Amino acid sequence: MVVLSQPALNQFFLLKPFKSTPLFTGIPVVDLTHPDAKNLIVNACRDFGFFKLVNHGVPLELMANLENEALRFFKKSQSEKDRAGPPDPFGYGSKRIGPNGDVGWVEYLLLNTNPDVISPKSLCIFRENPHHFRAVVENYITAVKNMCYAVLELMAEGLGIRQRNTLSRLLKDEKSDSCFRLNHYPPCPEVQALNRNLVGFGEHTDPQIISVLRSNSTSGLQICLTDGTWVSVPPDQTSFFINVGDALQVMTNGRFKSVKHRVLADTTKSRLSMIYFGGPALSENIAPLPSVMLKGEECLYKEFTWCEYKKAAYTSRLADNRLAPFQKSAAD
């Protein structure tokens, strides 16, 4: 990604001037080893749709190794990086977010979590030593998946679901439609003189069941609270941040809310984030779980397959309410 002139910057969404948002100190923190972790998770998902996870069991070495490999790729020349794209949907992409006109000050690698798919993509990403990149990615994803299973099983317990694996089995399914994304937000000093904030990734919710984010020490992530206030999330490169996705909102019949979030680019420092998106198989039916609903409680959402929802999501803009077409009305 190159230095931008003022006219070039105009194609990106520049937020209006506002006082810098202080880092929000009220982010829920869940210790995965805490005796009451199941209830802490449920409370955080209900009140915020988001929480910070500590004592997660993923070795810091795996995080550092992947960060180093990602930065090694993003520091390549643009022509070299372009050989790993365009995204189909997997591969390298820059500035364009999806097919419907959304843009951001970001470049990324999007990968399937299936090792058989990672392998051929690795040849395009690092031609000189693809096997090392593949091993680093697979080691990280395996560790994060296992951690994610534990979170979902505690979540099921906290919701009073009798079978602990009700949620985790969807991600353990060999046909699980999960993916992994490396986002790089280069510094953009040209924006500083404009008294604007450059959006790296515009406001949106994640469509999957759950997403697991880890970033370097550069801030930029913001979440929207239930009252509509945007707050900045303090970075912590040793911890993970867990997002409730649209599918989980439906499965809990609205008890959990998929959190709206965005990323603002920094003027002087680059931000690198790595996100695991845990999704079900394409054929999986998504609907409110009877085991979480009270007697006589009405379903807020129509049943749909993950494939149907995914197709609908790809026809929408980033900030759209993608669940709206699947919400039940009084006439249903």
From Swiss-Prot:
Fe cation binds at residues 204, 206, 261. It comes from the Eukaryota. It comes from Phaseolus coccineus. The keyword Oxidoreductase applies. The lineage of its organism: Eukaryota, Viridiplantae, Streptophyta, Embryophyta, Tracheophyta. Belongs to the iron/ascorbate-dependent oxidoreductase family. GA2OX subfamily. InterPro entries: DIOX_N, IPNS-like_FE2OG_OXY, IPNS-like_sf, Iron_ascorbate_oxido_reductase, Oxoglu/Fe-dep_dioxygenase_dom. It catalyses: gibberellin A1 + 2-oxoglutarate + O2 = gibberellin A8 + succinate + CO2. GO terms for molecular function: gibberellin 2-beta-dioxygenase activity; metal ion binding. Coiled coil: none annotated. It is an enzyme of class 1 (oxidoreductase). This is Gibberellin 2-beta-dioxygenase. The gene is GA2OX1. The active site is at residue 271. Its cofactor is Fe cation. Catalyzes the 2-beta-hydroxylation of several biologically active gibberellins, leading to the homeostatic regulation of their endogenous level. Catabolism of gibberellins (GAs) plays a central role in plant development. Converts GA9/GA20 to GA51/GA29 and GA4/GA1 to GA34/GA8.
